[in-house]
Each structure stands twice: as structure tokens, then as C-alpha cells.
Design a protein with these regions (language model features):
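Short, Lys/Arg-enriched N-terminal segments with co-localized hydrophobic residues
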Residues: 1-21
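N-terminal "arm"/small-domain region of PLP-dependent enzymes with the aminotransferase-like
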Residues: 15-70, 166-167
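PLP-dependent aminotransferase class I/II
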Residues: 53-54, 229-312
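Short loop-beta-helix segment that forms the pyridoxal 5′-phosphate
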Residues: 72, 84-106
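Conserved PLP-anchoring active-site segment centered on the Schiff-base-forming lysine
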Residues: 110-131
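Active-site phosphate-binding strand-loop segment of PLP-dependent enzymes
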Residues: 144-214
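PLP-dependent enzyme catalytic core of the Aspartate aminotransferase-like
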Residues: 187, 334-335, 344-380
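Conserved PLP-binding catalytic core of the aspartate aminotransferase-like
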Residues: 305-336
Length: 380
């Protein structure tokens, strides 16, 4: 197919920023989970599995404690073998890191792009990694009228940039996106993959939350191992509830993996992480149970929030983005509940909040607290 076969060309504006320096959107705490500076009983600001860590992973971590006098396996052999079997891909096409964030940085160091394209709003870690090579970061702004979905418009703009020799060297996309929870349609993402591979644009797909959705069969891992320009990144953090362990992985061609491996320090995956990861891969039933439960609770929370008069965006992950004119962050913090203030996300503003989908009783406590603070505000 030629470029013109894909779509007609329409121009839109993309805002460019030299480098990825911190501005008003990133100078605040750029992640949720700020429990170290706040007295919190319920933390809805981090998108972790509502069931927490699987028992099998807890046991593996307990057993591994007694082995920590040893160095970890530098080749991550057992975990790599188990992952290759689970994904049905060659072991040489998988690379583990100290969380997905380390892998994003390694990708930037290896590819050395001059220009990097990210969506707005999206995970700030992409900008952070781009700053390691002082790349020019450009943003494609998603529209709330489109439910923050990536539409055909993006494909058309990418085509225009390719024809004008203005295309970025590297693109970060998240599927589903964070903080919106919105997934990219398979048709759109397929067109983007085709364009990037055809025109030598490195495409990094962040699938860290895909296991919470019903779109696991749309993963691009199997595609990535046959491409020189596609990389898929995932993490154990969210689905297995182990952010403190730090374990992420990517799938790419063998040649790409070898290139990326050279950017990582030796022993970057701890012994604890390797044992936890191997145990986690045995938890298929746990993942399935989580996905089903999260879907029901997400729908439940969406309905309850809308009944309170809040604007909620329809996502597919284990979190929800909503809007209120009230300062809900401070109001709920007084009740020892922490939600994610999304005003420091580029493309969002004051009034946008993200909450994790948790267990029924915790979700009910949040709704009750919101009813109370909103009722008090209305009385005033």
C-alpha cells in the first residue's frame, strides 16, 4: 500500500517544545501514590490491582529473601524462559528491566531520536525518558469531545508529516492510555504500525495496563518480534500489584533486543524481582479474575459518579478519569483519601481527577465521601 491509500491528508496543529524540561505541568509530583507526604487510609491515586499481590508471589518473595546474599542471575534465564513460553515468542526477543521506566530510557539511549512524539494527556515517563537525550518533544493533543480517543485524524497528520519530511523519529503510544483508560482501535493502531515500519519511525507501544482490559488478543507483541521498528513494553507493577519490586519487560526483534540490552547495567533485575516475576507468570486465574472484577466495578463507579453530577470518561482500564469544578483532591484528603489530581498532565487542566478501581467496599467509601463533600459544597 502507498501512503495515499491509507487516508486523505488533513493538517492539524501540533505544539512543539525544545527538549523535555519540566514546566508547570510536570513540576508537581508526576505520579500518584504520594502517601509519604500525606496521612492516607485509602489511596485511589495509584492504579494497582485491587486484589493486591497474589499469594504465590508473596511466597516467592519470602523464599527469595534468604537468597539475597547472592548476586541475581545477570541473564535473567529462568524468568526469560518462562516468559517466552507464556507469550509463545523466542526468548531472544524479550528483555527485562527495572520497571518499564528503565526500558523507556534504554530505548531513547539506543535509538537517539532527534524528535519524539507523545500524546497529551499521557504518561509523563515518556517525556522524562526523552529528556535523557535532550530530544525535541512534540505533542498530539487528544480531544475530550472524542472521548480522548486516538482517531483517524492522527493517522492523517502522520501521513502529512511523512510527506513533508517532518515526521518524528520515535513515537510513544499507550494502549490503554493513562490517565484516560481509553484504548486505541485495532484499525487505527494497525495503520500507525504500517506507517512507522514503512518509514523507519520507531514506535513504542506501552501495554502496561492491557491485562486489565478485554483487548489482550489485540496485543502487538507477536508483531513486534518481526519488526525492526516496533517495541512493545509491559510491566508486572500494575496487574500483579508489585510496584515496589520494579519489574518490566519488552518484546522486540532479536536485533533490537541486542541493541537495547547494551544500554542496561549488569544485574539490573534484582533477585527478588526475578523470583516474583516467575511466580507471577503462574497466576493466569488471578489475572482473569482481576479483569472480570475490574470491569464490573468500573461500570459501577462510572454510574455512581455520574449520578453525583460528575463528568466521567469511558475507559477500559482499572482507573477512571472524571471532571469536577470542586477541589475534590483537598476535600478528600481531609477524609484521608487520596485521588490523583491530573492538572499537571499536559492536555488537561484543573478539575480533572483520576481514581483507581478498587474493591466494592472501598469504592463505596469513596462514593460516600464524595456525596458528603459535594453535598456540603452545595449547601454553602
Amino acid at each position: 500500500r502507498s501512503i495515499d491509500d491509507i487516508a486523505k491528508i488533513h493538517r492539524i496543529t501540533i505544539w512543539y517544545q525544545r527538549g523535555a524540561k519540566m514546566d508547570k505541568h510536570t513540576e508537581k509530583s508526576v505520579h500518584g501514590g504520594d502517601v509519604y507526604r500525606n496521612q492516607v487510609e485509602l489511596d485511589f491515586s495509584v492504579n494497582i490491582n485491587p486484589f493486591g499481590m497474589p499469594d504465590g508471589v508473596k511466597k516467592a518473595l519470602g523464599d527469595a529473601i534468604f537468597l539475597c546474599t547472592q548476586y541475581p542471575d545477570e541473564k535473567v534465564s529462568k524468568l526469560s524462559e518462562a516468559m517466552a513460553k507464556k507469550l509463545d515468542v523466542p526468548q531472544e526477543c524479550i528483555l527485562f528491566g527495572n520497571g518499564a521506566s528503565e526500558l523507556f530510557v534504554a530505548i531513547i539511549h539506543a535509538r537517539k531520536p532527534k524528535t519524539v512524539l507523545v500524546l497529551a494527556p499521557s504518561f509523563s515517563g515518556y517525556e522524562h525518558s526523552a529528556a535523557c537525550e535532550d530530544c525535541q518533544v512534540c505533542y498530539y493533543y487528544l480531544k475530550k469531545e472524542d472521548n480522548f480517543e486516538l482517531t483517524e485524524h492522527f493517522v492523517q497528520e502522520l501521513i502529512r508529516q511523512i510527506k513533508a519530511h517532518e515526521a518524528p523519529d520515535l513515537i510513544f503510544l499507550a494502549n490503554p492510555n493513562n490517565p484516560t483508560g481509553v484504548c486505541i482501535s485495532f484499525d487505527i493502531i494497525s495503520q500507525i504500525v504500517f506507517l512507522c515500519c514503512e518509514h523507519r519511525i520507531t514506535l513504542v507501544i506501552d501495554e502496561c495496563f492491557i491485562e486489565f482490559t478485554k483487548r489482550q488478543n489485540e496485543s502487538l507483541i507477536k508483531t513486534a518480534i518481526h519488526s525492526q521498528y516496533l517495541i512493545v513494553v509491559r510491566a508486572f507493577t500494575k496487574i500483579y500489584g508489585i510496584p515496589g519490586v520494579r519489574l518490566g519487560y519488552l518484546a522486540a526483534s532479536e536485533k533490537m533486543v541486542e541493541c537495547l540490552k547494551r544500554q542496561l547495567p549488569e544485574w539490573n533485575v534484582s533477585l527478588l524481582a526475578q523470583y516474583a516475576g516467575a511466580a507471577a507468570l503462574q497466576e493466569d486465574e488471578f489475572v482473569q479474575k482481576t479483569s472480570e472484577y475490574v470491569e464490573k466495578q468500573r461500570e459501577y463507579l462510572t454510574e455512581k459518579l455520574r449520578l453525583l453530577g460528575l463528568t466521567v470518561w469511558q475507559g477500559e482500564a482499572d482507573y477512571l478519569l472524571f471532571y469536577s469544578e470542586k477541589n475534590l483532591y483537598e476535600m478528600l484528603l481531609k477524609k484521608k483519601m487520596l485521588i490523583r489530581d491530573c492538572s499537571n498532565y499536559k492536555g488537561l487542566e484543573s478539575g480533572y481527577y483520576r481514581i483507581a478501581v478498587k474493591k466494592q467496599e472501598e469504592n463505596d467509601r469513596l462514593i460516600a465521601a464524595l456525596e458528603e463533600v459535594l453535598s456540603d459544597e452545595n449547601i454553602k
